[in-house]
Design a protein with these regions (language model features):
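Residue-level signal for inorganic ion chemistry
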Residues: 11, 44, 77, 86, ...
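DPxDG-like acidic metal-binding loop motif
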Residues: 30-93
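N-terminal subdomain of lithium-sensitive/metallo-dependent phosphomonoesterases centered on the IMPase/IPPase/PAP
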Residues: 1-42, 75, 129-132, 190, ...
Length: 221
């Protein structure tokens, strides 16, 4: 709750844009066409395990009728002191002790293996089926929205998510991926959008460095 309070305090210094957070709302998002979407701790299991794979997620959302799209996002990993940020009008960037610079997706080309990133705690039958369709692949396990961020920075190609998530779990990283030239699609292959008011749960989604794998993704649904 302390992280939530600090984030809300700092966002309010910018303007009075409503804030939707996993820990509680500030203002009415339906009163305007934009809102902040906040997850003060993404990766609770990783936080408990003390493996460092948890993040703070903040997204600026724009409303389109009853759906919302992320236009800017910030993902911060406190343990590594690394921040990923960007969106549809701001090229994505990574800043941290290992260096600073603009990011761009870097999809693998045959005969190189597809670089697949998956959750360290959630893996089921559909994950296995999708991996089998890829054929030649390398798998990295990771927690929180870091999985999407390494796609954005060019270190992975695909992050399929078949498990349950909420809007604040991925929206910030979605913006970062978009700003790096990648895509985040729903089960039909369309750009993932969000409901931040009522049904906060996301459908399954795929984060990808490009659209080569979208057809296989849609067929699996």
């Amino acid at each position: 709750m302390a992280a939530h309070n600090l984030i809300v305090q700092e966002l309010k210094k910018i303007d009075q844009t409503p804030i939707v957070s996993e820990e509680g709302n500030e203002g009415d998002p339906l009163s305007t066409d934009t809102c902040w979407l906040v997850d003060p701790l993404d990766g609770t299991k990783e936080f408990i395990k003390k493996n460092g794979m948890f993040t703070v997620n903040i997204a600026l959302m724009r409303r389109n009728k009853d759906r919302w799209n992320p236009i800017f996002g910030v993902v911060h990993a406190p343990v590594t002191k690394t921040t990923w940020f960007g969106g549809i009008v701001i090229p994505s960037e990574r800043r941290g002790p290992d260096g600073t610079g603009l990011m761009m997706v870097n999809p693998s080309m045959p005969p190189n293996p597809v670089r697949l990133v998956a959750s360290g705690t959630h893996r089921g039958e559909k994950d296995e089926l999708f991996a089998q369709k890829l054929g030649n692949y390398d798998l990295v396990r990771m927690g929180s929205s870091l999985k999407a961020c390494i796609v954005a920075e060019g270190s992975a190609d695909l992050y399929p998510r078949f498990g349950p998530t909420s809007c604040w779990d991925i929206a910030a990283a979605h913006a970062v991926v978009s700003g790096a030239g990648g895509i985040v699609v729903d089960p039909s292959g369309k750009n993932l959008d969000y409901d931040v008011i009522e049904n906060i749960l996301n459908p399954y989604f795929l984060v990808a460095a490009d659209n080569r794998w979208t057809e296989d993704w849609v067929k699996l649904q």
